């Protein structure tokens, strides 16, 4: 009896979720609303650019054997999964992480904590750091970065919320 009740409750819950999804789709003029994903952390990209790209050739070869390939994958995979608009914010975030780490090393301050993700308050990024990131990330990760990223200061770019399409389908195949 308890098993039947639990199965009935589970079926009701699933039916309610499908009904809500259908309502969302039909009100959205044939398109499902997408749920925002948390933004990826860009620390790996900053670490990769500092440790694998900006080092002399001999050190770079040593890193290549140890961890650069993995760091590159961990940087590029989330970058490829976000919208072009969000990539502009990601470029700014990577540039800011590098800037803060360089400032910390210059002034004897501790480096930025690893848990930081992009979308936090922004400082003006030096042009040379931004240029290096803009020249490296798109070709390294085979992604497009919007043209306005090259001319718009990071402090004016608002964090972009991006979505990954829902896996559920709506009634009538509209979504």
UniProtKB/Swiss-Prot annotation:
<keyword id="KW-1015">Disulfide bond</keyword>
<dbReference type="InterPro" id="IPR016140">
    <property type="entry name" value="Bifunc_inhib/LTP/seed_store"/>
</dbReference>
<keyword id="KW-0708">Seed storage protein</keyword>
<dbReference type="GO" id="GO:0045735">
    <property type="term" value="F:nutrient reservoir activity"/>
</dbReference>
<feature type="signal peptide">
    <location>
        <begin position="1"/>
        <end position="19"/>
    </location>
</feature>
<protein>
    <recommendedName>
        <fullName>Avenin-like a3</fullName>
    </recommendedName>
</protein>
<comment type="function">
    <text>Seed storage protein. Not integrated in the gluten polymer through disulfide bonds, unless incorporated by reduction and reoxidation during dough making. Increases dough strength and bread volume, but decreases dough stability when added into a base wheat flour.</text>
</comment>
<dbReference type="InterPro" id="IPR036312">
    <property type="entry name" value="Bifun_inhib/LTP/seed_sf"/>
</dbReference>
<keyword id="KW-0758">Storage protein</keyword>
<comment type="similarity">
    <text>Belongs to the prolamin family.</text>
</comment>
<keyword id="KW-0732">Signal</keyword>
<dbReference type="InterPro" id="IPR001954">
    <property type="entry name" value="Glia_glutenin"/>
</dbReference>
<dbReference type="Pfam" id="PF13016">
    <property type="entry name" value="Gliadin"/>
</dbReference>
């Amino acid at each position: 009896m308890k098993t039947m009740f639990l199965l009935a409750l589970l079926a009701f819950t699933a039916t309610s979720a499908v009904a809500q999804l259908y309502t969302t789709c039909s009100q959205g003029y044939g398109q499902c609303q997408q749920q925002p994903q948390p933004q990826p952390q860009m620390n790996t990209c900053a670490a990769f650019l500092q440790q694998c790209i900006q080092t002399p050739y001999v050190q770079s070869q040593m890193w290549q054997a140890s961890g650069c390939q993995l760091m590159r994958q961990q940087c590029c995979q989330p970058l490829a999964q976000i919208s072009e608009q969000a990539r502009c914010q990601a470029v700014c975030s990577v540039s800011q992480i590098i800037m803060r780490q360089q400032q910390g090393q210059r002034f004897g301050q501790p480096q930025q904590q690893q848990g930081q993700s992009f979308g936090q308050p922004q400082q003006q990024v030096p042009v040379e750091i931004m240029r290096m990131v803009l020249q490296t990330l798109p070709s390294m990760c085979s992604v497009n970065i919007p043209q306005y990223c090259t001319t718009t200061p990071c402090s004016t770019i608002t964090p972009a919320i991006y979505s990954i399409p829902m896996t559920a389908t709506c009634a009538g195949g509209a979504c």
